[in-house]
């Protein structure tokens, strides 16, 4: 079917206008289209005539619509007979509106062109169809569509011009997304109410139930979304960062939240010292550790991030000297096996940290000065005395959205201000360089980045303040 024919049919199926409605009346969206159908004499001919009539552009085309339906004659429909709904230009009583293909098939008795009343209900229309029919035309350009889905909660950020329609927008979202039970609207910026990146919200639809369960990277997280930070749009970034970690290494997650980096890393045998200052995040992190059975590898902390950075290296070194290890129980042998059960595998905690993760983009760079003197007096743990390298720091941050290298320079200067070493954009593995990864848009003029660099020796081994 050519594009003009498709547009012609689709225009007939536009949702009825319900301009400026403030409450949802689903009955408004019911309509009946007086159409025609090809009543097929035998169902085995359905595929043949669908293909032929599509070539002649006589089959009704509409997104989400299957033109093969039960025959309009109840007695034939009860026998399982089907029909093909035809385009509106086909008139049952006017053979001159039929193509030669349709006329010939009718003469052969393989089909009959009959009237067909096509009933369309509210369920047929998608979210955009319904909302467009309600909003004034001048608001069609930026219909609220992008939202975070956290478990059963849809989190909107509705702009001012759409606020008069917020409740009806929420109701349509609930209707068209069965997995969503609650719709909320953010009424302040994340973190503006407190330091834990939570936000004030209003419930637009459904119950005020923020206890959610989400699955990410094969892990289950349960939490109260109103009390902790979670962003489902960061799942790709979580996977990217954890892909750098190797089993048996130690990672210090400074602003761990409820564990989107820590718990998946623990699943792959990485030791994670996971910290968050928010007591609620710490509580749900502990739950995630138990739920996902990663307690051998993930250790939760509830400290201020500044203090955690300064003490983390010493804590890991002490754990290594104590002989701390993860004990991995091997799979049980078959019941009838005569072989003795295998011994548990012990994975020792290494003496040094391989990676630091700092996912607090609004202010994480301001924590970097705490790395000065991190390994003061322990130079012998690293190259050239051993094969161990200093840790890589992954620090998330915001910067301007620009096409040139201005954001990169800005990030390098801010890092320099904190650690006293000027890095240049490049490779995280190379001395004096920093890999600046563009994570995602967060606002029209703002983007989120992740700066990854190996901690410079002059910082790590500096005298402690």
Curated annotation (Swiss-Prot):
It catalyses: guanosine(37) in tRNA + S-adenosyl-L-methionine = N(1)-methylguanosine(37) in tRNA + S-adenosyl-L-homocysteine + H(+). It is an enzyme of class 2 (transferase). PROSITE patterns: SAM_MT_TRM5_TYW2. It holds the Pfam family TYW2_N_2. S-adenosyl-L-methionine binds at residues 238, 304-305, 359. Keywords: Cytoplasm, Methyltransferase, Mitochondrion, Nucleus, S-adenosyl-L-methionine, Transferase, Transit peptide, tRNA processing. The keyword Cytoplasm applies. GO terms for molecular function: tRNA (guanine(37)-N1)-methyltransferase activity. Specifically methylates the N1 position of guanosine-37 in various cytoplasmic and mitochondrial tRNAs. Methylation is not dependent on the nature of the nucleoside 5' of the target nucleoside. This is the first step in the biosynthesis of wybutosine (yW), a modified base adjacent to the anticodon of tRNAs and required for accurate decoding. Monomer. Belongs to the class I-like SAM-binding methyltransferase superfamily. TRM5/TYW2 family. This is tRNA (guanine(37)-N(1))-methyltransferase. It comes from Fusarium vanettenii (strain ATCC MYA-4622 / CBS 123669 / FGSC 9596 / NRRL 45880 / 77-13-4) (Fusarium solani subsp. pisi). The lineage of its organism: Eukaryota, Fungi, Dikarya, Ascomycota, Pezizomycotina.
């Amino acid at each position: 079917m050519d594009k003009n024919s498709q547009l012609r049919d689709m225009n007939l199926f536009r949702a009825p206008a319900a301009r400026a409605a403030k409450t949802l009346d689903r009955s408004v969206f019911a309509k009946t289209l007086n159409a025609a159908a090809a009543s097929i004499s035998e169902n085995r001919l359905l595929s043949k005539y669908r293909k032929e009539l599509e070539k002649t552009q006589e089959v009704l085309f509409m997104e989400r619509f299957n033109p093969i339906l039960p025959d309009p004659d109840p007695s034939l429909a009860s026998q399982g007979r089907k029909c093909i709904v035809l385009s509106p230009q086909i008139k049952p009583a006017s053979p001159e509106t039929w193509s030669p293909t349709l006329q010939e098939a009718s003469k052969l008795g393989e089909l009959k062109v009959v009237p067909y009343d096509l009933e369309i209900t509210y369920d047929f229309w998608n979210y955009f169809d319904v909302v467009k029919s309600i909003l004034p035309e001048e608001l069609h350009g930026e219909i609220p569509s992008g939202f975070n889905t956290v478990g059963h909660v849809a989190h909107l950020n509705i702009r001012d011009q759409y606020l008069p329609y917020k409740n009806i927008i929420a109701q349509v979202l609930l209707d068209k997304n069965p997995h969503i039970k609650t719709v909320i609207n953010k009424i302040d910026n994340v973190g503006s109410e407190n330091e834990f990146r939570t936000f004030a919200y209003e419930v637009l639809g459904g119950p005020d139930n923020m206890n959610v369960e989400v699955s990410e990277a094969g892990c289950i997280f349960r939490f109260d979304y109103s009390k902790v930070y979670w962003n489902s749009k960061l799942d790709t970034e979580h996977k990217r960062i954890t892909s750098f970690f190797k089993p048996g290494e130690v990672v210090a997650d400074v602003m761990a939240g409820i564990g989107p980096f820590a718990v998946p890393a623990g699943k792959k045998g990485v030791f994670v010292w996971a910290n968050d200052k928010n007591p609620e995040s710490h509580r749900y992190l502990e739950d995630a550790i138990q739920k996902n059975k990663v307690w051998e590898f993930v250790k939760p902390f509830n400290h201020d991030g500044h203090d955690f950075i300064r003490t983390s290296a010493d804590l890991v070194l002490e754990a290594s000297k104590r002989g701390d290890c993860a004990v991995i129980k091997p799979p049980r042998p078959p019941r009838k096996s005569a072989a003795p059960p295998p011994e548990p595998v012990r994975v020792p905690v290494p003496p040094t940290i391989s990676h630091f993760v700092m996912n607090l983009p609004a202010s994480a760079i301001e924590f970097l000065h705490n790395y000065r003197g991190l390994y003061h007096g322990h130079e012998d743990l690293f190259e050239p005395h051993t094969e161990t390298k200093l840790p890589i720091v992954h620090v998330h941050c915001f910067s301007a959205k620009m096409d040139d290298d201005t954001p990169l320079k800005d990030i390098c200067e801010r890092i320099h201000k904190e650690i006293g070493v000027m890095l240049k954009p490049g490779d995280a593995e190379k001395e004096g360089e920093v890999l600046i990864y563009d994570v995602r848009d967060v606002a029209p003029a703002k983007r989120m980045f992740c700066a990854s660099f190996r901690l410079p020796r002059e910082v790590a081994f500096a005298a402690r303040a």
